[in-house]
Amino acid sequence: MTLTPRTLTAEFLGTALLLAVVVGSGVMGETLAGGNVAIALLGNTIATGAILVVLILIFGPISGAHFNPAVTLSAVLQGEMRSRDAVAYALTQMVGAVAGVFLAHGMFDLEILQVGVNVRTGPGQWLAEGVAAFGLVLTIIGCVRKAPGAVPYAVGLYITAGYWFTASTSFANPAVTIARALTETFSG
C-alpha cells in the first residue's frame, strides 16, 4: 500500500467510525438492556461485527482497511508495507480511534473527555488479546490468499465471535484498546 493523504484519510475515517460504533452501540445496548449485561454485550457485538464488514468494503480498496496497528505490523512483516509508512498508519489509527470515542460521546450527549474505569488487565486479559490478535491476522492472511472477497465478512464474523470467546471481549487492536480507555461507558 502506498502512503498518500487519501490512504491516511481512509484509515482515520475507518478507525474513527469503528470506535464510534463500538462505544455508541455499547451505550445504546446498556441503555436498552435494562441491566442485562449479556443483552448489552450482544447488541455491542452485532453492531461491531456488522460495521467492520461495511468499513472494510468501503475503505479496503483505498487503504487496505487496516484500522489496527497489529494488522499494519503484519503487512510490514509480510513485505507489503514499508516500516516508515506503517508508523504513519498506526499514528493515524490511534488518532482516529480517539476521535471515534469522542464522536460517540458527542452523539449521546456525554462528556467528551472521560477516563475509563473498567479494569482490563492481568494475565488472562493479555492472553486473550494475544489470541484475538493472532486469530484476526490469521483470518486476514488466510482469506487474502484463498478468497480475498471474503475478507470483510470473515473479519466481521471473527470479531463477533471473539467478543464471546475471549476474556477481553476481543479488542484484538491496540488502537481500540487505547481509545477505549478514554470512555467511562459500557465499552470502556
Model-predicted regions and their roles:
Residues 1-188:
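Membrane-interface helix-loop junctions and terminal tails of multi-pass membrane proteins
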